[in-house]
Amino acid sequence: MGPNGNRPGRPLACVIGLLAFLAVVVGLGAAALPAAYAQTVGGVPKPTAEVAQPGGTSDETERLLAAIQVPVRDRLDLARRFRLSEEPVPAVVNSSRPSFTLGEKLSFWVGETDTQRHFEAIASLRYIGAHSYWWIQEGYDVRDEEVKASAKVFEDRIYPTNRAFFGSEWSPGVDNDPRIHIFIGNVPGVGGYFYSVNEYSRLINPYSNEKEMFFINIEAARPGTDNLASILAHEFQHMIHWRSDANEDTWVNEGLSELAMKLNGYNTGGVVTAFTSAPDTQLTAWGDTPDESIAHYGASYLFMAYFLERFGEDITRRLVAEPANGANGFNAVLEAAGRPERFDDIFADWVIANYLDDPGANQGYWGYTELDLGPVKVDAEHSAYPVERQATVGQYATDYVVLNGEGNLTIEFTGQRQVKIAANAAHSGRYQWWSNRGDDSDMTLTRRFDLSEVKQATLSFWVWYDIEEGWDYAYVEASTDGGQTWHILPGRYTTTENRSGNNFGHGWTGRSGAGETAEWVQEQVDLSPYAGGQVDIRFEYLTDDAVNRPGFLLDDIAIPEIGYWDDVEAGEDGWVANGFARIDNVLPQRYLVQLIEVGDSVRVRRMALDATNSGQLSVEDLGERLDYAVLTISGKTPFTTETASYTYRIYPAP
């Protein structure tokens, strides 16, 4: 989705409303449970371990998370595992290519962003191109010439440009038809969207249109206009990216879709200004609301445009098909190309480029050749010293502090040493299970239990969750056939409401507890139907196409009837994690502190920080040799969206 509003209910859209509709048809492949599941638990209670509380800046959790590849959500496999249909769910719903005629009417499911609901709309087929069908909703006055004008732009410019740069969509796709369907009509809350739900059978999601298609809001982009064409360029990249790397981080996917608009000759709107007006916007995250997300569009687009200018088309286009996500994807394509730079190196130069925008400086690394950014917002400006200030900054976001005045100065910086992944503490002890987070992903935590000696059983555990409400869901499940199929179990706080079509049963969504922030709550699940035998228990976290929250955390898991108790302190205890991680919720906070010195020439120096995140730089001849200086402060810790606090003190040098 783009800032003009292309996307609903978690589709990938253009900004008017931001949802996450970018599902996947990538297969994970179902298999029998691994041998590790054979470890069963009977009636031996496990004592609580004595574990030291965290101190210092251990990177234990960071190293663990860096080694995890978050699994892609495979809806065909989910349909089989959750027994959504008595018959196998087909990947392609038509055995032969369908036929449509001009003037034909068809009913479509349209997503409504604000309510997460869908409604049916009737549209007439007004144009058939070599690669597209054009459907106009009944009740809207649109001339044939307008439709043909937009169709010509899509067929002659957008389709070949996007395919040449980003790759191919799934074709002939779910409907066995190589043409893409374009619906234009009442699409509330967004400019338009691509939603991967439509790439699947209705047996998986009842609101699927079972077609490769885009939805365009006619109130935001009428046929015959550049606005409609730019939205199609944006959404077509999403469609291609879904086929190549379905669970790519939203910020990468959206940045490339904004880049697709530029490659096709269209303006990206006000997203650049939205970011330069709010540079303390995390590049590697995404906003929950349209207002929050516009600056993220700007950040991700600028980073992609900078990357393209610096490394060229070949390396940039490799990002789409690269299976590694986010920063890891950049590192992978750079390494494969034999380049020494890595994501953090590029980010450091990008921070400078966003302030200076001088393409003639430092081999072009400190500016943009094809963009004119305008001024970036300054967080603070000083001209009298000494001065001391405390502030916070996002991860992979930046505060710019301008230093004016005269003389020689000393800058002292101190930042916090640790940061959390989620804004909680373990319910007991130090460790907890974390679902991990990602888009279009499927994380599981599984263990086998022996209930053969009891007639009833209860699964008890404490849970803390902050999940994208109505779009992403977590479940607890049971299997008696070795993990081939699973039954979703109800809990105290689960819901069966399913406005988006994403809830497979009794799911947790939104925030745990009744407060404004998530809280630990105790869940109890009846396992009595499985008493008398062995049962596999699984926690599963499923996310949709775009936007994700901190996730789902577990602690103090018990089945009292068999004497089982696990406070997560002593290790994995037989749990098999696929995407989940046993964490202490402590990451070492890292910072990037740079000083831009502007005079007859420009120089950038980086502050070295010690183990306590403290460092010092000197500024000489301010007001004489130097016109001014700019201190840039960025958080630089992956795997979290929590902000980092810091303090700087600037005083005249003795």
Give each language-model segment a name.
Residues 457-463, 535-542, 568, 631:
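Extracellular beta-strand-rich recognition modules
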Residues 477-534, 572, 582-592, 596-614:
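Exoplasmic/lumenal beta-rich domain surfaces
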Residues 309, 450-452, 462-468, 540-542:
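Solvent-exposed strand-to-loop "edge" motifs in beta-rich extracellular domains
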Residues 197-199, 203-209, 226, 230-231, ...:
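Acidic/His/Gly-enriched intrinsically disordered linker/tail segments
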Residues 39-42, 325-444, 462, 470-477, ...:
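Beta/coil-rich, acidic/histidine-enriched accessory regions frequently appended to metallopeptidases
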Residues 127-256, 264-286:
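Juxtacatalytic substrate-recognition/specificity segment
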Residues 140, 432-444, 467, 510-519:
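Extracellular beta-rich ligand/substrate-recognition surface
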Residues 36-85:
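Intrinsically disordered, low-structural-confidence terminal and linker regions
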